[in-house]
Amino acid sequence: MEVAAVSATSRPLSPLLSTAPARRLRLLPPRCVFGRRLRASPRTRASVEPATQELGTAGAGEWSGDAIRRRFLEFYAARGHKILPSSSLVPDDPTVLLTIAGMLQFKPIFLGKEPRRVPCATTSQKCIRTNDIENVGRTARHQTFFEMLGNFSFGDYFKKEATAWAWELATKEYGLPAERLWISVFEDDNEAFDIWHNEVGVPKERIKRMGAEDNFWTSGATGPCGPCSEIYYDFYPERGSSDADLGDDSRFIEFYNLVFMQYNKKDDGSLEPLKQKNIDTGMGLERMARILQKVPNNYETDLIFPIIEKAASMAMVSYAKTDDATKTNLKIIGDHMRAVVYLVSDGVIPSNIGRGYVVRRLIRRVVRMGRLIGIRGDGHGNSEGAFLPSLAEVVISLSTEIDPDVESRRRSILGELQREELRFVQTLERGEKLLDELLDGAVLSAGNNGDKPSLSGKDLFLLYDTYGFPVEITAEIASERGVTVDIEGFDIEMENQRKQSQAAHNVVKLSVGNETEIIKSIPDTVFLGYDSLSASAVVRGLLVNGNPVNEVSEGSEVEILLDRTPFYAESGGQVGDNGFLYVNGGEDRSQAAVIEINDVQKSLGNIFVHKGTIKQGSVEVGKEVDACVDAKLRQGAKAHHTATHLLQSALKSVVGSETSQAGSLVAFDRLRFDFNFHRPVSEGELTRIELLVNQWISNAAHLETKVMALQDAKNAGAIAMFGEKYGEQVRVVEVPGVSLELCGGTHVSNTAEIRGFKIISEQGIASGIRRIEAVAGDAFIDYVCARDNYMRRLCSSLKVKAEDVNGRVETILEELRATRNEVSSLRSKIAVLKAASLASKATTVEPQNVRIVVENMGDVDADGLKSAAEYLIGTLQDPAAVILGSSPGDGKVSLVAAFSPAVVKMGLQAGKFVGGIAKLCGGGGGGKPNFAQAGGRKPENLPDALEKARAEIVAGVSSSS
């Protein structure tokens, strides 16, 4: 529903009844700066909710969660606010991992980095918060997934209107008794206090002044900030108003927070009034549902309880009659299932890093809680099945008004959850067994030493890295057994692992990321590159190492800001254009200053930053330049970008429509396409995909591009990238009958320009994510020609025709295998011959008369060493023990231990024995009690290792008497 914007001064304020309230839900950690946790006030400590608490009769009645959400949005739409959709849980903000508040999508507007598109807006925003995960299910109000209802003003209305409307919404729309509402205000915000008391009519005794830690919002050390005011609901007004503590969770719940952004905090800490005053509010939908539905906690609202009921039925327990511990586990399941469904729907795939780790941790927590309450298999009799999909079905059925796109992604969501659950169950039992052993060992060790039982960081890392146990789950289980965990030691182990792979994840930021004043003062760049590869432009700014300068001379690297440009700036996976800027010096371009452009990036929304080197002359701010894009490279990017669209359509056609894009790279000479899929794409499927793409190329279809409303594009079936930020008007690129995508990139005008398409590789890059690399256009021709040359040379070397290469290679490989087998057999015979001379040198150890051979056999390989040991153990009479070592070359060490049955009965085991010796040689190994092999990388240590082996076996045999 769209409502025309009305100025704040023209809006009539509704009559206000006397009584109290106002504040935003503390769904962020206490006092947050865009998700950065600040020190918590003592009053925010969560109280544990008794599982048997009853505050009212459950049931949504008139006030279903959907009705509460709808009423909020319609209330503000009627007051001039534009209803905007929830943004993705994957934010377009590198400073936060997940969307944690309703204001996050408007952060650039609040910080003055982007112009406002509407004067005021209202949203219901999906949010994820995991910092208080240990309180989920144990208190009445903590959740990982929640919806934040919000109304926002971007310089339109301010404190008076925001306060009046919040009160009207709470008391008139939702019908909350005014006498049950309390207000908190910033201690120095007399204006807000006066509005609440004198205009709204809240009694002074129900307005509490709070300190800056609780009621003053900041965006960082400097920048926009302001006081906030919060509305609380009082569950027990009969307790009176004297000495009432709004931090008492058993009595009060904060459900609405109003942030008044009216100051700019300067470097010296002083506050100056903002020219544009903003409003940022947030109401917790689940909290309001708890109040209106008269249930004892957020979990028993109609937003979550259907999931709990489903889990209870699968566990064959009654929620109403079960014990408190089971209720807590059911609440955790209900909460976490909402989080994982919406995260997976927004394209977050379980993994061991970043957002993927968040969803994996939540999934595995649900699986563990399900097992604790008795759910086995799929919960419907199939012990080999998964139960998460059944719970996810309930979440999806509740999602219609939260996120309409979830239903269309049902198949991929259910498939991903099933795979992740079964994957975890496969390792869970092994991991649980090891964890039990580690916990038993910790308790036993502590008992012997008188210390408190604890698991080391190495133990935690082993469970995490090998068995997939999130450290938080290990800590939970350990806590249940009274065992502490060494989180600091675990962090050290994790850091060591990160250092090994850090290079692969480094991100290089442009120096303009410092957001210098020059960038902020320059208007958006006009992009001309869809229609032209050259244009005249004016230099609006120059940056060297991020600092503004007026002139740059030959040899310097520079970042150039133009008023308009034909250069495409990197976005949507497509790399930025290359080319040249010529400082206008008349008709003779040879006399002009020349800047070679090797990259173009966007800054602060839509300012194009041209990165390059001054090759000749100098350039000054204000000068006119001729901007010329490298046409050949641009054509390569266009061919690969259109080919990427065709590839995505072919993938969906061949392997299933549930595949979705997870990322892409469109370069001048190649393309890379990452997609969500649970298995490798077969050779046959890859061939079919190639054929489809090349067929569409040969159809010579003309592409169509148009700009339309975002919702119209979605209704037409246009594919949108998960997490991508789109405006109200979007550019749609269509290959008729084949592909329809939202895309701002450059494309060929006709598919025939692509010339051809070839897949180079297909591989997995993370759990549930596959990658295809391919070439198109001139790169395709180059690739085919290179492969043809390779084939010619191969045919010449093998002296066969191309069609006979495969057969000839197989013959050569078979001959090679036979030759290697012959060589190995000969080496084994030689080793046995050497061993024959060793049998007579065996040492006899009393009192068991054990025959022992410990010998260095030179360069004998591992197979020969094994044959020699088998020969000796068969030749020597039982009891006998043989330990052989060798250095076969390439810095390798081979070790073998063979013990006869009588020696094994003495308690000596070859597997354990050889592993310990191998460590001296920089390796390891093991095997059975009677026979084991090992290896190493330090041949220089072999003599000492064998001497130690001799001493230990003699000692072991001697002591066995």
Swiss-Prot record:
The lineage of its organism: Eukaryota, Viridiplantae, Streptophyta, Embryophyta, Tracheophyta. Belongs to the class-II aminoacyl-tRNA synthetase family. Catalyzes the attachment of alanine to tRNA(Ala) in a two-step reaction: alanine is first activated by ATP to form Ala-AMP and then transferred to the acceptor end of tRNA(Ala). Also edits incorrectly charged tRNA(Ala) via its editing domain. This is Alanine--tRNA ligase, chloroplastic/mitochondrial. GO terms for biological process: alanyl-tRNA aminoacylation. Binds 1 zinc ion per subunit. Zn(2+) binds at residues 641, 645, 743, 747. InterPro entries: aa-tRNA-synth_II/BPL/LPL, Ala-tRNA-lgiase_IIc, Ala-tRNA-ligase_IIc_anticod-bd, Ala-tRNA-synth_IIc_core, Ala-tRNA-synth_IIc_N, Ala-tRNA_ligase, Ala_tRNA_ligase_euk/bac, Ala_tRNA_synth_plant. GO terms for molecular function: alanine-tRNA ligase activity; aminoacyl-tRNA deacylase activity; ATP binding; tRNA binding; zinc ion binding. Consists of three domains; the N-terminal catalytic domain, the editing domain and the C-terminal C-Ala domain. The editing domain removes incorrectly charged amino acids, while the C-Ala domain, along with tRNA(Ala), serves as a bridge to cooperatively bring together the editing and aminoacylation centers thus stimulating deacylation of misacylated tRNAs. It catalyses: tRNA(Ala) + L-alanine + ATP = L-alanyl-tRNA(Ala) + AMP + diphosphate. The keyword Chaperone does not apply. Monomer. Its EC number is 6.1.1.7. Its cofactor is Zn(2+). It is found in: Plastid, Chloroplast; Mitochondrion. HAMAP family: Ala_tRNA_synth_B, Ala_tRNA_synth_plantC. One of its GO terms (cellular component) is mitochondrion. The keyword Membrane does not apply. NCBIfam families: alaS (TIGR00344). Keywords: Aminoacyl-tRNA synthetase, ATP-binding, Chloroplast, Ligase, Metal-binding, Mitochondrion, Nucleotide-binding, Plastid, Protein biosynthesis, RNA-binding, Transit peptide, tRNA-binding, Zinc. It is an enzyme of class 6 (ligase). It comes from Sorghum bicolor (Sorghum).
